[in-house]
């Protein structure tokens, strides 16, 4: 099966189950706002959402720099958003660069799994970048990012 190279972005709300329990019926609105803010950053920087499930988003970009720019924009938007009941929605994000195969079910391959694992090690409000992606970014990171 033929593969393509992508820059992957995986996002996940930290502590989403506890947050959903605290917010009750307001949780649906939180999810809607979260997805809207993430989608806005994806659209601005040329990202393409592959799948979203619950509080997770998996997207791809043509370049690592566009992916980093989208992640930074999304984190800033999430941080400045007025969430209900004074809650803070903290999102962990992971960025990885690698190959994946397009299947009827979506993208598949070891690098897709690695991207998810990279996001899992992030803390809420943090973007973790794999060595594979970081190696392509060394000379093009935005000011203040390192």
Give residue spans per PLM region.
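Catalytic NTP-binding/metal-coordinating core of nucleotidyl cyclase/transferase enzymes
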Residues: 1-70, 76-77
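Catalytic beta-strand-to-alpha-helix segment of the class III nucleotidyl cyclase homology domain
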Residues: 39, 58-146
């Amino acid at each position: 099966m033929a593969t393509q190279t992508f820059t992957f972005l995986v996002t996940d709300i930290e502590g989403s189950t506890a947050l959903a329990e605290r917010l009750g019926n307001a949780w649906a609105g939180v999810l809607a706002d979260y997805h809207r803010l993430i989608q806005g950053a994806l659209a601005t920087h040329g990202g393409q959402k592959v799948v979203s499930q619950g509080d997770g988003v998996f997207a791809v970009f043509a370049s690592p720099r566009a992916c980093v720019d989208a992640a930074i924009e999304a984190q800033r938007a999430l941080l400045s958003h007025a969430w209900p009941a004074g809650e803070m929605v903290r999102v962990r994000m992971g960025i990885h660069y690698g190959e994946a195969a397009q299947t009827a079910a979506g993208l598949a391959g070891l690098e897709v799994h690695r991207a998810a694992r990279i996001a899992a090690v992030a803390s809420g409000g943090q973007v973790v970048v794999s060595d594979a992606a970081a190696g392509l970014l060394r000379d093009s990171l935005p000011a203040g990012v390192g």
